[in-house]
Swiss-Prot record:
Similarity-based family: Belongs to the orthopoxvirus OPG045 family.
Function: Plays a role in evading host innate immune response by inhibiting host inflammasome activation. Interacts with and inhibits NLR-mediated interleukin-1 beta/IL1B production in infected cells. At the host mitochondria outer membrane, interacts with the BH3 domain of host BAK and prevents BAK from binding active BAX. In turn, host apoptosis is inhibited.
Protein name: Apoptosis regulator OPG045
Short name of one Pfam family: M11L
Gene name in the database record: OPG045
Amino acid sequence: MLSMFMCNNIVDYVDDIDNGIVQDIEDEASNNVDHDYVYPLPENMVYRFDKSTNILDYLSTERDHVMMAVRYYMSKQRLDDLYRQLPTKTRSYIDIINIYCDKVSNDYNRDMNIMYDMASTKSFTVYDINNEVNTILMDNKGLGVRLATISFITELGRRCMNPVKTIKMFTLLSHTICDDCFVDYITDISPPDNTIPNTSTREYLK
């Protein structure tokens, strides 16, 4: 299943990603009339990922547009409030992860797109995804594969239009990805005062 695109693609590029980084720096529910229906837990729901990320594909009526506006507002307020509460150290780690994951996504854009398209033809539960990622990270201790996994899971979240399933996936996968290896990498990269130097991304990655 997931191994068809995760193991055969991400792992195939682990060495390239690691070396590159080292060199650079390092819904339908509301329409259900069966009141006895038992809804599946989020972790047991099947994930389907669409090849198209065009949001207009999901906004066909005025109600769809209004609901999306409300959802965006509520989500943004929640994230903005969370960011305001974060200490400087956490914000500095956010900046580091932004820099590195953006670099991986840009440098390996073609490879990532191949994996996204392959994922679009499959369906998985959150545990399918988590188990595959866990296996990959146990076998590969490099920083590159962890950054690639973050970028990959983030893009899958963009293509999964169900926000409940997306949040569940992000929550569980963040626990799996942030193993001792990744924590050590990020804390080693972080400047002593937990601030990001005011330099270009390229300079910082050298």
